[in-house]
């Protein structure tokens, strides 16, 4: 018999299909996916649930506006959510819909049980009702009230800003107050039940201490929902209908409840902060009434906001996840969502930050590390990773110790749902590995045959760190880890598993890297892409930059010899090269053109060369180019480079040519 795995059950809220899925839905679901993938990586039997809440007055009204049935409407919207999950490569185990028979049958049984127990009773309700929120409010809860000339309240706005109307109807009620003390006791004995901690204080102080009122759990003002057993003029309201999905999806109250017995209670339920109250008051009280164990944790995350507040079409600030994936790749979006915003807090989406994350974190830090490593293994060892030897250079053990510490910190952060912290720790390992290249200077070691052992050690440490980085990236990015494994020539599945990160030097000697690595994240033109995203948010994006560039390439004009003669090409010797602060593409050259003084030229090749590699080379310079200022530095010329597959290579002149020789 195979050893039984530890289980892990994680859920997102079921989304209300009143419109197109947006980046907020993507954020919650990608976060859940990262946690599910992390636990699978560690060997857990994971059940990841998401879905749609498909009943209610608002949906009934939307379907009527469209002239279609409610079922046709929710089928269409639910399909849109499932398409987005596929696009995001969400690894959910199941997708529950509240219109499915498996859900409806179980909900009917739950309602009957609570009614028979006396936890639900029939009464009458009068209050201020918001159709948009599908919730009743007392007069004191209203954000704004409207009064007539006699001072009588005649309307108002809910805390959400939506209009309310006075509604009186017969309703079934749930005796919430019966369980209030027991719930607070549970909070106190289970400190991790509500996270972050601030959410728990909010629930106690704002909702429980003032006194829990009995909760209306049925409606008669609309009929698109699950009929109350024995009283079909009532439909079961969202508090029982939607919240119970977390157990109905597992087969609760059915003849086949194997999954329920195996996975319940949930380990983590991820929800947006606006619905924490429903999941930490209504939901646990319902479970107490059913005599079922409560979830181990409800994590209320913040919102992704824009500079001008929440996303809305009227503000022209809606971010379409499909657009970001199609233009920049899935991993760029997944990385940004989980790195930019501390999970549990609100965060801002800006096009500038998104492009910077792609360029600096993904293309520069991670992409360049892979490119340089593969290129050096090809150059110095004919593409074969040498046998591992530990502690050869003075920096080797420092790097290994740093890795061990990062793994420990990363694991702690992931266990506490701190995704941005875990990614920050992982990027510190990427930065430390890049620093290791600068410290060991493999291009210098390669010039000394006596340093061959040290050079081999550097290559194995770089490859091994990249392997471990790829393993740790697997919860977050779905495609990049596989590309790193591919470029490093790693085929053994054991090298991609979680347990492999605790050791070191696991890559077999002679493993062959790819001959020519391709950039896993091409750099973006920041100005062009920021403008593109802004225009897309407003609904008026220009043609993609790639298409424009392709047309321009086909229409390059021909020139006469008289035009070419205007260009003064000279041989120059590189005397000094420095990186330019806050400009990761630029290098600042001091060149000898035989003029009796050095000339300063800036070139955008920093991602392809270390400064030390270029000193002493003879290069070709356009010497009569009009001087320009870049990043506050004057550039007096242009160094010629060739381009292939997105990589630039400096065109070198013969060492026999004197400095300043004219190139014809």
UniProtKB/Swiss-Prot annotation:
Transmembrane segments: none
Self-association and partners: Homodimer.
Chain location of the short sequence motif 'KMSKS' region per the record: 310-314
Chain location of the short sequence motif 'HIGH' region per the record: 15-25
E.C. code: 6.1.1.10
Family listed: Belongs to the class-I aminoacyl-tRNA synthetase family. MetG type 2B subfamily.
Phosphoprotein found in the keyword field: no
GO CC terms, sorted: cytoplasm
GO MF annotations in UniProt: ATP binding; methionine-tRNA ligase activity; tRNA binding
Pfam families per the UniProt record, alphabetical: Anticodon_3 (PF19303), tRNA-synt_1g (PF09334), tRNA_bind (PF01588)
Reactions listed under catalytic activity: tRNA(Met) + L-methionine + ATP = L-methionyl-tRNA(Met) + AMP + diphosphate
Domain called tRNA-binding: residue spans: 563-664
Alphabetized PROSITE patterns for the sequence: TRBD
Role, per record: Is required not only for elongation of protein synthesis but also for the initiation of all mRNA translation through initiator tRNA(fMet) aminoacylation.
InterPro entries referenced in this protein's UniProt entry, alphabetically: Anticodon_Met, Met-tRNA-synth_bsu_C, Met-tRNA_synth, Met-tRNA_synth_2, Methionyl/Leucyl_tRNA_Synth, MetRS_core, NA-bd_OB-fold, Rossmann-like_a/b/a_fold
Localization (cell): Cytoplasm
Chief location: cytoplasm
GO BP, one annotated term: methionyl-tRNA aminoacylation
Sites where the protein binds ATP: 313
Protein name (record): Methionine--tRNA ligase
Enzyme class, spelled out: ligase
Record keywords: Aminoacyl-tRNA synthetase, ATP-binding, Cytoplasm, Ligase, Nucleotide-binding, Protein biosynthesis, RNA-binding, tRNA-binding
């Amino acid at each position: 018999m195979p050893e039984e795995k530890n289980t892990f059950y994680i859920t997102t809220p079921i989304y209300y299909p009143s419109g197109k899925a947006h980046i907020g839905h993507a954020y919650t679901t990608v976060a859940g996916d990262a946690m599910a993938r992390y636990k699978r990586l560690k060997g857990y039997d994971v059940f990841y649930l998401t879905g749609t809440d498909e009943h209610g007055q608002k949906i009934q009204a939307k379907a009527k506006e469209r002239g279609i049935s409610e079922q046709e409407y929710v089928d269409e919207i639910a399909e849109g959510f499932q398409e987005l999950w596929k696009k995001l490569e969400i690894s959910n185990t199941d997708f529950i819909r509240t219109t499915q028979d498996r859900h409806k049958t179980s909900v009917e049984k739950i309602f009957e049980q609570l009614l028979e127990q006396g936890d639900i009773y029939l009464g009458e309700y009068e209050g201020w009702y918001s159709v948009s929120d599908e919730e009743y409010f007392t007069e004191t809860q209203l954000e704004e009230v409207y009064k007539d000339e006699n001072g009588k309240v005649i309307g108002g706005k809910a805390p959400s800003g939506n209009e309310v109307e006075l509604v009186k109807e017969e309703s079934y009620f749930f005796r919430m107050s019966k369980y209030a003390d027991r719930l607070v006791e549970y909070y106190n004995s289970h400190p991790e039940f509500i996270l972050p901690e601030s959410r728990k204080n909010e629930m106690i102080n704002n909702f429980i201490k003032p006194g829990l009122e009995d909760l209306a759990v049925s409606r008669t003002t609309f009929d698109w929902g699950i009929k109350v057993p024995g009283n079909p003029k009532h439909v079961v309201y969202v508090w029982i209908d939607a919240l119970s999905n977390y157990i109905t999806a597992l087969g609760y109250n059915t003849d086949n409840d194997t999954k329920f017995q195996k996975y319940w209670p949930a380990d983590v339920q991820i929800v947006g902060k606006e619905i924490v109250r429903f999941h930490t008051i209504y939901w646990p009280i319902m479970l107490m009434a059913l005599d079922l164990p409560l979830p181990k944790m409800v994590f209320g995350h913040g919102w992704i906001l824009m500079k001008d507040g929440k996303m809305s079409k009227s503000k022209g600030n809606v971010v379409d996840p499909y657009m970001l994936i199609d233009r920049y790749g899935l991993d760029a979006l997944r990385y940004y969502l989980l790195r930019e915003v501390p999970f549990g807090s609100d965060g801002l989406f800006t096009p500038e930050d998104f492009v910077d994350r792609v360029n600096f974190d993904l293309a520069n830090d991670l992409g360049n590390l892979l490119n340089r490593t593969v290129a050096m293994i090809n150059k110095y060892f004919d593409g074969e990773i040498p046998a591992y030897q530990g502690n050869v250079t003075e920096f080797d053990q420092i790097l290994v110790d740093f890795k061990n510490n990062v793994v420990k910190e990363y694991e702690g952060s992931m266990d506490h749902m701190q995704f941005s912290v875990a990614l920050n720790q992982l990027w510190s390992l990427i930065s430390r590995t890049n620093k290791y290249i600068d410290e060991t200077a493999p291009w210098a070691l390669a010039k000394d045959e006596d340093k061959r052992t040290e050079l081999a050690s550097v290559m194995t440490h770089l490859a091994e760190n990249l392997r471990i980085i790829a393993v740790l990236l697997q919860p977050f990015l779905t495609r990049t880890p596989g590309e790193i494994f591919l470029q490093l020539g790693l085929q053994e599945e054991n090298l991609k598993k979680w347990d492999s990160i605790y050791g070191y030097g696991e890559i077999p000697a002679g493993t062959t890297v790819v001959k020519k690595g391709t950039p896993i994240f091409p750099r973006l033109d920041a100005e062009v892409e920021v403008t593109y995203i802004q225009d897309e948010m407003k609904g008026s994006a220009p043609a993609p930059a790639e298409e424009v560039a392709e047309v321009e390439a086909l229409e390059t004009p021909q020139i006469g010899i008289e035009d070419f003669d205007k260009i003064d090409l000279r041989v120059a010797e590189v005397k000094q090269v420095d990186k330019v602060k806050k400009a990761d593409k630029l290098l600042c050259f001091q060149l000898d053109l035989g003029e009796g003084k050095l000339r300063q030229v800036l070139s955008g090749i920093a991602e392809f060369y270390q400064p030390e590699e270029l000193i002493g080379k003879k290069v070709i310079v356009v010497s009569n180019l009009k001087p320009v200022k870049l990043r506050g530095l004057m550039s007096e010329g242009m160094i010629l480079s060739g381009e292939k597959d997105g990589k630039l290579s400096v065109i070198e002149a013969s060492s026999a040519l004197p400095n300043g020789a004219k190139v014809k």
